[in-house]
Amino acid sequence: MQLLVPIYKRHSNSNFKVSSCSSSPMCPVNGKLQLHDGRTAYHFQPAKFWQNDPNGPLYHNGLYHFFYQYNPHGPLWDTGKLSWGHSVSGDLVNWAFLGTAIDPTDPFDVNGCWSGSATVLLGGRPAFLYTGRDAGGVQVQNVSFAKNPLDPLLREWEKPSCNPIIAFPADVINNNFRDPTTAWLGRDGLWRMVVAAEVAGAGSALVYRSADFLRWERNAAPMHSSAAVPVLECPDFFPVAEHGIDGLDTSANGGGTGVKHVLKLSEFDTHQDFYMVGRNRRVQWLWVNEYDSKADDVAKGWAGVQAFPRKVWLDGDGKQLLQWPVDEIETLRTKRVGLQGTEVKAGGLHEIVGVASSQADVEVVFEIPNLEDEAESFDPDWLDPHKLCKDKGAASAHGGVGPFGLIVMASGDLQEQTAVFFRVFKHHGKYKVFMCTDLTRSSTKADVYKDAYGGFVDVDIQKDKSISLRTLIDHSMIESFGGGGRACITTRVYPEHAATSSSHLYVFNNGSGTVNVSKLEAWEMATATVNSADALDAITRS
């Protein structure tokens, strides 16, 4: 069994706030949610209040169930005690809110039902593993079971009296013991799960095993440990096929059968994955925090958005996980415009018109005809992608091959704009492709977080002389996928002047040579039904 250990990070504004829906301009009107203050049109978010970590996505009895950290009392993480919100869907696009699945009502979770996971047991009964904060504020691990597994909506959950199933370990410090993973069944008939903990100052992924899902014993050695961070938030462990894009059930075992296992670790708490029986794919969720001010979130009455669900698979060389929006998103595509064989010369700016660019899906392939002549030298000291994106990758800068890409959510005078782009460097006869999202000019507001994020894209641009970019634009949410999903950047923007009806979309090139747009397709996206009052009837009828 081989382990891949990617480390993911998120960037967020830690200022969280509260208000009631009664004063919020985004409250439902005649069952429909109004798009104000950056509310998205086709991404998952509750009708009101706070959400964060995805916690137990599963596919059961023909429906997708999504559970998530939810404050049913306001859009604030640290006031109130978190519950698990529960929504269902028939297509991963349109969602109905079912209320809360579990709430902090017992001594072992009275201070909050924190993050965890869902596992479907033998016989088909779903179970939650989750962290509770007990009456003393101590983090312990608990279990809850679906009361009626035959109920397609899984409305009722019960907590056995034997909770907590894992008490706080003696060698764990600083109350860092949380986030149990989806369990997997080994060939020895034992269930196993991973729990994040701080042991001797290091972040550790502790392994526990059980025969009955109620009594758990800890393995002597952790699955992984790192002194770089005190706790590895929300670990995840799952198999992927070495060949092809099919997902695998969590209990699939390697053993030389073309399976690799992935241990996903994070310095922050962002991701959750699940396997979809019948479709043979692994789907990933990603929480994206707000970057705006306390006053903004108090006024709008909600906080937190989920990225659009992504399928996850291993690339052909077996070295990298790829991410891509699930195919169901294409059902939202409506009006289409396109470009083909268009030159964008040095300093060029080409507007894409004909679609509502604040709610769009854009796919583009760029060709670089003069790669060898134009690429700048790469400095080996440029090891920090975040710093490189700020210092060398700014969209307004001029370089050799790039920056080139898309400008999205732009005002007519370009005073506000967000750039998603590539830049290519040369180092010892090889080429390094850098991808960046630059928020520094995304808004004229002074009280929103505006930074630049970047990463290297593992592609052989010397061979192909081209690179692809896909960007999902949904008002305050921008998701970009470079090189077919080899690099992904997700962020939030809050423009004042590039409103829903007045935003602009451009292809740009600030490099010294010409870049060709070999193909561009942009689709206007319909508005999904997400947690509004009339969603459940439509979902259960379908």
Curated annotation (Swiss-Prot):
Induction: By rice blast fungus (M.grisea) 48 hours after infection. Down-regulated by sucrose in excised leaves. It is found in: Secreted, Extracellular space, Apoplast; Secreted, Cell wall. Its EC number is 3.2.1.26. May play a role in stress response. Disulfide bonds join 389-436. It catalyses: Hydrolysis of terminal non-reducing beta-D-fructofuranoside residues in beta-D-fructofuranosides. Substrate binds at residues 50-53, 69, 77, 114-115, 178-179, 233. CDD domains: GH32_Fruct1-like. This is Beta-fructofuranosidase, insoluble isoenzyme 5. Keywords: Apoplast, Cell wall, Disulfide bond, Glycoprotein, Glycosidase, Hydrolase, Secreted. It comes from the Eukaryota. It is an enzyme of class 3 (hydrolase). Glycans are attached at residues 142, 510, 516. Expressed in roots and leaves. GO terms for molecular function: beta-fructofuranosidase activity. The active site is at 53. One of its GO terms (biological process) is carbohydrate metabolic process. One of its GO terms (cellular component) is apoplast. Belongs to the glycosyl hydrolase 32 family.
